[in-house]
Amino acid sequence: MTLSFTARWRDELPATYTALLPTPLKNARLIWYNDELAQQLAIPASLFDATNGAGVWGGETLLPGMSPVAQVYSGHQFGVWAGQLGDGRGILLGEQLLADGSTLDWHLKGAGLTPYSRMGDGRAVLRSTIRESLASEAMHYLGIPTTRALSIVTSDTPVQRETQETGAMLMRLAQSHMRFGHFEHFYYRREPEKVQQLADFAIRHYWPQWQDVPEKYALWFEEVAARTGRLIAEWQTVGFAHGVMNTDNMSILGLTIDYGPFGFLDDYDPGFIGNHSDHQGRYRFDNQPSVALWNLQRLAQTLTPFIEIDALNRALDRYQDALLTHYGQRMRQKLGFFTEQKDDNVLLNELFSLMAREGSDYTRTFRMLSHTEQQSASSPLRDTFIDRAAFDAWFDRYRARLRTEAVDDALRQQQMQRVNPAIVLRNWLAQRAIDAAEQGDMAELHRLHEVLRQPFTDRDDDYARRPPEWGKRLEVSCSS
């Protein structure tokens, strides 16, 4: 089957990009590709044949129909207007046309210098490409909206960061790479007609049902806000901290995008800061809902030329509604509740307080809770708490709440185990795969990708255990 590519972004939004070709790496070679995703997209296996060189995965060739561009956008970074940004090392190669008429961006990260590289070198490093590939695939299999990773290429090109590292490329796929920052760019350039063109593009291709509706812009922004709310709720329930929620890292489609200094909670710490460059804690775990609203307010500002203020405020209210509703639903599922009762939040917050005091492992606590038998006062989870009396008191109230519903243990446990993962991408697991890959051993990279495809399956090995002490102290930065 021949892959078909279109160039809607290039054809319809000429002010938003610079056309250019990728700059290949030295002795580039394919070290991993997403076989499952490739099969779903009917990508010929021959394209992954290492004897053909790095090919499209290393920017050495293009597939028929590809028209590469680097996109321009701006944004607020750490709450401060940063001006023009853009694809400083990534190139949108083309948009794959799928059988249902939708498209999928093929975006090559680490593809070389662009007009938007600023002081950078246009490169990505092996460390960061591995982290992003693992994180985006982990999030996908957790059921959280995200970009996808298709391939990783390594090379003999040295790249200087804090130390000298290995140049690499990642093929990232997404329904769209449209960001809040695209709209900010033209708003601050005082070109509202181009802001409106971006909105028209989004509606035409992603919400075509609203094209001929008079209030299409208001409906569209409401949906952007609601999707953002649901996304943040998913992050909070699974214990994911993005690390760098700048407006240029926010997706119009409500996707998790731009994996940099992210982290999944190990010990439950609501103030967890994943990014060691975030000295003020702006992007700490428990501040993500507020930051997302702030970012939506910045996007709303760009839409004032063609959406009424009242409509924008209603949309921002939709964010709060979507966030709280989805978060509440998901947390009740994690606790095994099938109905909503007025004291559920009290019970949840009491558990969080216990976990915070004890430094309980976030993922393991909820996974172990999902094995609870409501008639049994004993639980393996009890042994993980130092203050057994406090846990016992909470656990008695929890079991009493379970008994208010006519749901047997098997059904409830089944529901809980579908939403409480046994496996998340802990930083130490990613680092172990990176360390091996930097020594030329890709086995752990491949193994970890396979493990992350089944996050809701119990395991009795390193992948499901608490991290070693050194693994809790890993510092992650934006220096990708």
Curated annotation (Swiss-Prot):
Its cofactor is Mn(2+); Mg(2+). Mn(2+) binds at N249, D258. One of its GO terms (molecular function) is ATP binding. Disruption phenotype: The deletion mutant exhibits a significantly reduced survival rate after a long heat treatment and in the logarithmic phase under acidic medium. It also exhibits significantly reduced viability and significantly decreased intracellular content of iron under metal-deficient conditions. The deletion mutant exhibits significantly enhanced motility compared to the wild-type strain under iron-limited conditions, while there is no significant difference between the strains under iron-rich conditions. The mutant cannot turn off the expression of flagellar antigen upon entry into host cells. It holds the Pfam family SelO. It comes from the Bacteria. The keyword Nucleotide-binding applies. InterPro entries: adnlytase_SelO (IPR054838), SelO (IPR003846). The active site is at D248. Induction: Barely expressed under standard laboratory conditions but expression increases to high level under multiple stress conditions, such as nutritional deficiency, H(2)O(2) stress and acid stress. Also induced by heat shock. Induced by metal deficiency. Expression is significantly increased after entry of Salmonella into host cells. Transmembrane segments: none annotated. Its EC number is 2.7.7.-, 2.7.7.108. The keyword ATP-binding applies. ATP binds at G86, G88, R89, K109, D121, G122, R172, R179, D258. It is an enzyme of class 2 (transferase). Auto-AMPylated under high ATP levels. Is probably auto-AMPylated on Ser-479 and/or Ser-480. Auto-UMPylated. Auto-AMPylation inhibits the UMPylation of chaperones. The UMPylation activity depends on Mn(2+). Keywords: ATP-binding, Magnesium, Manganese, Metal-binding, Nucleotide-binding, Nucleotidyltransferase, Stress response, Transferase. It catalyses: L-histidyl-[protein] + UTP = N(tele)-(5'-uridylyl)-L-histidyl-[protein] + diphosphate; L-seryl-[protein] + UTP = O-(5'-uridylyl)-L-seryl-[protein] + diphosphate; L-tyrosyl-[protein] + UTP = O-(5'-uridylyl)-L-tyrosyl-[protein] + diphosphate; L-seryl-[protein] + ATP = 3-O-(5'-adenylyl)-L-seryl-[protein] + diphosphate. Belongs to the SELO family. Nucleotidyltransferase involved in the post-translational modification of proteins. It can catalyze the addition of adenosine monophosphate (AMP) or uridine monophosphate (UMP) to a protein, resulting in modifications known as AMPylation and UMPylation. It is involved in stress resistance and plays a crucial role during infection in regulating essential bacterial processes, including flagella synthesis and iron uptake. This is Protein nucleotidyltransferase YdiU. The lineage of its organism: Bacteria, Pseudomonadati, Pseudomonadota, Gammaproteobacteria, Enterobacterales. The gene is ydiU.
